[in-house]
Amino acid sequence: MKRLLISCLAAALLFSCGDANVLPEQYRQNDQKTKEEKQENNNNQEEENGNQGQEPQEDEGFETAAEAVVHMGAGWNLGNTLDSNSGDAEGMWIEAWSQRTPKDYETAWGQPETTRALIHMFKEFGFGAIRVPVTWYPHMGTITLYDNDKWDQSTWTGTAVDPAWMARVKEVVDYVIDEGLYCILNVHHDTGDGSTAWLHASEEGFLAAKDRYQALWEQIADTFKDYGKRLLFESYNEMLDPLGSWCFASFNAPGSYDAAVATSAYNGINSYAKLFAETVRASGGNNALRNIIVNTYGACSGDGTWSSHLKEPLTEFVLPEEPGHIAVQVHSYWNDEAFSSQKSDIDKLFVNLDTHLVKRLGVPVIIGEWGGKTKNDQSNATFAAYFAGKAKEAGIPTFWWMGLSDGDDRTVPRWTMPKTMGAIIQAYNQ
């Protein structure tokens, strides 16, 4: 199943095509590596003063968010995998036609089960980080269907995450951490414009969902509280107003703007960000100093000049805590085939991020998703070389969405878009 990602300029999923570079045989062994990161950064001190659960200190291995983003470099999204879900309350096909096992969800959108060898391939070729998108609603509480495949969200009860699902998420995170890579773990298609989304950017939406949202992050934070600095939590993916407006809040309103809807949406986003930060910090263990990530409205990056409201997701965002262990994330998709005419717009994007986020808030920025519109490896490589080069100059890590290794190529594992992969790595290594 294909999942469309929408942005102001373009949207795309990148599926299997083109030449492929295969990971050497010696790297396809499912070896059990030592968990150096978690052991090195387990900072619950008990030696001298007996203060069990004492908060970790900076000199015990944790770094600032600004340091972390520089160390990440090139990243990739393990997309259409743990984020897979039915996505339609009128057609809950996974729930209706499967046993609802972790594998049923992980493979529902056409990707194989994630392996350690796949993650190792990214490490071997020079990537520094992997974002692990996770959709949680199918695995929280009890979802009861009617008419075989329909879901009335008002009947949703309970907030406990299925232990089997949490265990699989943890296993995949361990693959990333064990390779010495940074890992971003998030709340993904619980947001967006689908009818199964339950997190909406509005004051009313926040009040309705805040208890469930807090309960979810309490469970995630507790599960991973002893992990070291290479694990980052991301608050939510692309949260939209109740109208499902992309680009900026209330874009789908009559006249393409409604000040009241927009204000409520930006207030809602800021409230979710604040609750997320407070919940993680209160959860104990290494979460007191863990680097966390909050996204702008819709993860919008202010691309374009066709509306005076395009910069609002940046200018209206309020940082939920003092800078130090927090970063802001945006997403940015482009038409790779029209790249030559977009260079100046890409340049402006990085100026806007610097002006409205880095300098205004004193916070580092992550581009958590980016990509081109087509599956053409050569045109994407040309575009990626320029975009990644500008990001490297700005000190911003970028996470390409999906297609570098896709579908059956992940099983080998090998590259689906080797030229694009190489262009990204070269840009960050210059």
Model-assigned labels for residue ranges:
Residues T101-K103, A215-L232, Y236-P397, R410-A427:
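Extracellular glycoside hydrolase catalytic/binding regions
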Residues W401-D406:
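Acidic carboxylate-rich catalytic motifs and surrounding loops in phosphoryl-/glycosyl-chemistry enzymes
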Residues M140-G141, D193-G194, E337-F339, D408-R410:
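A short acidic, helix-capping loop that chelates divalent metal ions and anchors anionic groups
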Residues P56-D59, G110-E113, T305-K311:
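Short gly/ser/thr-rich secondary-structure transition/capping motifs
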Residues G61-G302, I424:
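Active-site mouth of glycoside hydrolases
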Residues M1-F15:
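Sec-dependent bacterial lipoprotein signal peptides
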Residues L13-E60:
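Bacterial Sec-dependent N-terminal signal peptides
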